[in-house]
Amino acid sequence: MATITCTRFTEEYQLFEELGKGAFSVVRRCVKVLAGQEYAAKIINTKKLSARDHQKLEREARICRLLKHPNIVRLHDSISEEGHHYLIFDLVTGGELFEDIVAREYYSEADASHCIQQILEAVLHCHQMGVVHRDLKPENLLLASKLKGAAVKLADFGLAIEVEGEQQAWFGFAGTPGYLSPEVLRKDPYGKPVDLWACGVILYILLVGYPPFWDEDQHRLYQQIKAGAYDFPSPEWDTVTPEAKDLINKMLTINPSKRITAAEALKHPWISHRSTVASCMHRQETVDCLKKFNARRKLKGAILTTMLATRNFSGGKSGGNKKNDGVKESSESTNTTIEDEDTKVRKQEIIKVTEQLIEAISNGDFESYTKMCDPGMTAFEPEALGNLVEGLDFHRFYFENLWSRNSKPVHTTILNPHIHLMGDESACIAYIRITQYLDAGGIPRTAQSEETRVWHRRDGKWQIVHFHRSGAPSVLPH
């Protein structure tokens, strides 16, 4: 059967000069010939994409189609042709917000308030549409045009994810080092609050021209962030109003559940009553510091783009030392996006949830156990005498009549775990479980079982859909 190749982009659009270049894509000005309308085309070479990269590209296009807001760069079309994919966006000609600020003759706290208000409006729209950006930083804050008072536009949804309501889950280690939240660094479940943390970092920079967390050594930088170790040093912060500092404190709150939301931040007096609360004094020191900050960002960005351009899109076929191959390892990566969802990290995640499941079993915690199991879970285990068990009722019996009554210490060890990743949302783990316990007479015993568990991720949460346990029926392991 003949394959029909799409040529719609080639037929409808004419390409012009290059506007920007990433490691794996190029952005060029284009014109829709019949309408005479200008756009920016992000061109991705799909020949270099893995199946995983294709999924990410589809996710980005799907998310961008959802978002329609004056402070977000709009996606107008998404076209796939042989060897290339084209994302057709608004043509924004004003450049980066931070570059525009340093060219201004006058810049005050009130101007910073107006900037962060527009960023928060964009973030609020994202969150209302169930989208978390995950990569808010100066490079992704653009201006619609060169005209004075042009709108701030949020760009680059390459790392954005879809979430349900206020859902918190582990979506992978992703973002830009200096803007990462404590919960991401702790590898805790996360959600919309990560964007507000990044807004806090951006607002801090908007007011003084340098970031709240900074260290050339990435490990020390991450320690600072996890500890929330920032301050408002003299003399530059002495002229900043208490209300501005209060908003930063509310954004840079370590506990994500206590962190201010986008809707709440927009109601903060420093934003909602800008004309009477925010200072109008010109901040020359901020402009001078911001010039240095911009120069440092550009230099480091250029170095990393050059490094990354030599790698495959997935970074998996470079042939280099894998340990040093990721951007994550580089101290030069403070302003460069990373997405550390490589095989090693994902396998560690499966081991972690398996350990949590076994801990729930050892503690006789049926409630936690059920949260980690699909309601229709199937199982082969010795206690079922060769029968396939479906659902949780069979397992409930052991929790109610054995585990809940066992007050003696139990120690479990997982040996030789082998994990098979089956796409983004499924994984299989096989291992030997050694269980040490005290029998009825108080004598230490050891039991062994060979187990295979199949995990499936739904709405960001891993659940067991099937398991198989070998060995003789035993008193404790389940």
From Swiss-Prot:
Residues the record lists as Phosphothreonine modifications: T286, T336, T337
Domain Protein kinase: 13-271
Active site: D135
Localization per record: Synapse; Postsynaptic density; Cell projection, Dendritic spine; Cell projection, Dendrite
The entry's keywords: ATP-binding, Calmodulin-binding, Cell projection, Cytoplasm, Kinase, Lipoprotein, Magnesium, Metal-binding, Nucleotide-binding, Palmitate, Phosphoprotein, Serine/threonine-protein kinase, Synapse, Transferase
Domain of life: Eukaryota
Chain intervals for the UniProt region annotation (Interaction with BAALC): 310-320
Gene3D superfamilies noted in UniProt: 3.10.450.50, 6.10.140.620, Phosphorylase Kinase, domain 1, Transferase(Phosphotransferase) domain 1
Ranges of biased composition (kind: Basic and acidic residues): 322-331
Residues covered by region (Disordered): 314-341
Binding residues for ATP: L19, G20, K21, G22, A23, F24, S25, V26, V27, K42
Cell membrane is among the record's keywords: no
E.C. no: 2.7.11.17
GO molecular function ontology, one term from the record: ATP binding
InterPro entries: Ca/CaM-dep_prot_kinase-assoc, Kinase-like_dom_sf, NTF2-like_dom_sf, Prot_kinase_dom, Protein_kinase_ATP_BS, Ser/Thr_kinase_AS
Assembly with partners or alone: There are 4 genes encoding calcium/calmodulin-dependent protein kinase type II chains: CAMK2A, CAMK2B, CAMK2G and CAMK2D. The corresponding proteins assemble into homo- or heteromultimeric holoenzymes composed of 12 subunits with two hexameric rings stacked one on top of the other. Interacts with BAALC. Interacts with MPDZ. Interacts with SYN1. Interacts with CAMK2N2. Interacts with SYNGAP1. Interacts with SYNPO2. Interacts with SHANK3. Interacts with GRIN2B. Interacts with CACNB2. Interacts with LRRC7. Interacts with GRM5.
Family: Belongs to the protein kinase superfamily. CAMK Ser/Thr protein kinase family. CaMK subfamily.
Protein name stated in the entry: Calcium/calmodulin-dependent protein kinase type II subunit alpha
Taxonomic classification: Eukaryota, Metazoa, Chordata, Craniata, Vertebrata
